[in-house]
């Protein structure tokens, strides 16, 4: 359509041939349109970017002639050429010579700012960018119209209409992006389900994310129909078909992370072997694995079948130490008893030298003072000769290698066997009346005998 001056008012329709030709021809004249063309072509978007139109209308005669030539130019190219050449530039630029420069930022209309600020990110992520609208028509960028004479009343109306068109274009593009995201999500879910079908066969493993996995669900009748025959660490709870280890009974609120050995299924079922030898899968024999104590508060009541090697070693060492202690005690007891026997033998050896006057044992009429008698000591007794002779008793002990002395029980005097016999003879009353020898000593005769 033309105004009163005969100029063509081109609204940037993609099907218009005259404006398309002039725009394609004068595209290098606009320095600001080049980075936008490269950006749109790199993103694969067939939409026309919002480039500032500078001095679209020229009032000189030369531009009028040029516009008249454009009116008589051939029709628009066919749709096949338009859609088949995605690399061809469809950027609308202004006609004119190289002397025309872009206007200042005051001339930029509201549609350009809205399109640059509120452009959705989904248009840059998806390669097709939904170049068609919902009704099949091609979306066009808004056009800024400015004149040299400064008449902006008409341009303001155009700017308002273009702003409304840009807003509707943004809404339509968001709806298309939402539809595309739903389609892509469905395709991704289908692709992940296909990956999960071949995941346990060694090709690919499914990725579990979130509370619900996006991969395909396994059938309930056959929970894990696996073909791999290797050891798999299961980070989740094992199904009820898998038997628990025999050393631990089933307890509530206890989900152990166990190692299950998976084998090929038999008769369309799951063949999972987990018995008493399942602990060997960790790389250690069953004897070296520590077990739970039944006496603790958190035990499961079952007696442990596998004993720790450290516990067994400690028990063996303790048994050896106890046996060694018992051996030492028996040896000490045997040594002490043998020492007593040897002392008895030595005393017996010394006694025959003294004759039959000194005999082993204690006299029945001996009176003890202090702590009483000690029958376990090597007691000997003798009876003195003469009118003043009496029976006395004493304790023998080894004084030297071949000498034995006797401590009398009446006075606690250490003497030789000969002196012990004379002490029981006639000189006994004189010693009893003597002040140096008390009749009944209060001291311990056993202690004096050991000293």
UniProtKB/Swiss-Prot annotation:
Subcellular location, record wording: Nucleus
Chain intervals for the UniProt region annotation (Disordered): 1-223, 321-346, 427-451
Family to which the UniProt record says this protein belongs: Belongs to the Ninja family.
PANTHER family assigned: AFP HOMOLOG 2
Composition-biased stretches (Acidic residues): 154-163
Name of the protein in question: Protein NINJA homolog 1
Keywords: Nucleus
Species of the source: Oryza sativa subsp. japonica
Gene Ontology annotations for the cellular component aspect, listed alphabetically: nucleus
UniProt-listed InterPro entries: Ninja_fam, Ninja_motif
Composition skew (Low complexity), residue ranges: 207-216
Subunit structure: Interacts with TIFY10C/JAZ8. Interacts with TIFY11A/JAZ9.
Main location, first listed in the record: nucleus
Keyword Disulfide bond attached: no
GO biological process: jasmonic acid mediated signaling pathway; negative regulation of DNA-templated transcription
Basic and acidic residues bias spans: 23-35
Keyword Nucleus: yes
Domain of life: Eukaryota
Pfam families named among the record's database cross-references: EAR
Ranges of compositional bias, category Polar residues: 38-49, 86-103, 143-153
């Amino acid at each position: 359509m033309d105004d009163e001056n005969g100029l063509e008012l081109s609204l940037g329709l993609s099907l218009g041939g005259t404006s398309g030709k002039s725009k394609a021809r004068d595209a290098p004249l606009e320095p600001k349109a080049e980075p936008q063309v490269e950006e749109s072509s790199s993103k694969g978007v067939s939409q026309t970017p919002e480039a500032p139109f500078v001095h679209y209308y020229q009032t000189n005669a030369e531009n009028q002639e040029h516009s008249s030539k454009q009116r008589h130019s051939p029709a628009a190219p066919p749709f096949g050429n338009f859609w088949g050449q995605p690399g061809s530039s469809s950027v609308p630029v202004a006609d004119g010579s190289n002397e025309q420069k872009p206007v200042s930022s005051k001339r930029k209309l509201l549609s350009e700012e809205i399109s640059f600020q509120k452009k959705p990110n989904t248009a840059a992520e998806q390669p097709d960018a939904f170049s068609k609208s919902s009704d099949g028509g091609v979306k066009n960028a808004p056009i800024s119209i400015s004149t040299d004479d400064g008449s902006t009343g008409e341009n303001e109306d155009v700017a308002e209409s273009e702003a409304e068109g840009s807003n509707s274009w943004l809404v339509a593009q968001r709806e298309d992006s939402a539809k595309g995201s739903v389609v892509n999500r469905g395709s991704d879910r289908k692709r992940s389900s296909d990956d999960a079908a071949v995941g346990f066969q060694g090709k690919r493993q499914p990725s579990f994310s979130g509370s619900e996995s996006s991969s395909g669900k396994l059938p309930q009748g056959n929970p894990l129909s696996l073909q791999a025959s290797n050891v798999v660490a299961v980070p989740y709870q094992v199904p009820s078909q898998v038997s628990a280890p025999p050393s631990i009974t089933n307890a509530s609120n206890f989900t152990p992370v166990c190692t299950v050995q998976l084998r090929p299924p038999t008769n369309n079922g799951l063949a999972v072997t987990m018995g008493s030898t399942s602990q060997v899968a960790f790389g250690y024999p069953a004897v070296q694995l520590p077990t739970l104590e039944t006496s603790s508060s958190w035990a499961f009541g079952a007696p442990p079948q596998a004993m720790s090697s450290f516990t067994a070693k400690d028990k063996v060492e303790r048994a050896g130490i106890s046996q060694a202690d018992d051996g030492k005690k028996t040896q000490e007891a045997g040594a002490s008893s043998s020492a007593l026997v040897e002392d008895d033998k030595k005393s017996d050896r010394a006694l025959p030298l003294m004759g039959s006057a000194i005999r082993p044992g204690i006299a029945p009429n001996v009176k003890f003072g202090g702590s009483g008698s000690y029958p376990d000591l090597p007691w000997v007794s003798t009876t003195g000769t003469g009118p003043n002779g009496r029976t006395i008793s004493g304790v023998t002990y080894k004084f030297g290698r071949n000498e034995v002395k006797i401590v009398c029980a009446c006075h606690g005097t250490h003497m030789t066997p000969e002196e012990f016999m004379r002490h029981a003879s006639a000189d006994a009353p004189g010693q009893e009346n003597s002040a140096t020898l008390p009749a009944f000593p209060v001291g311990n005769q056993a202690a004096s005998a050991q000293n």
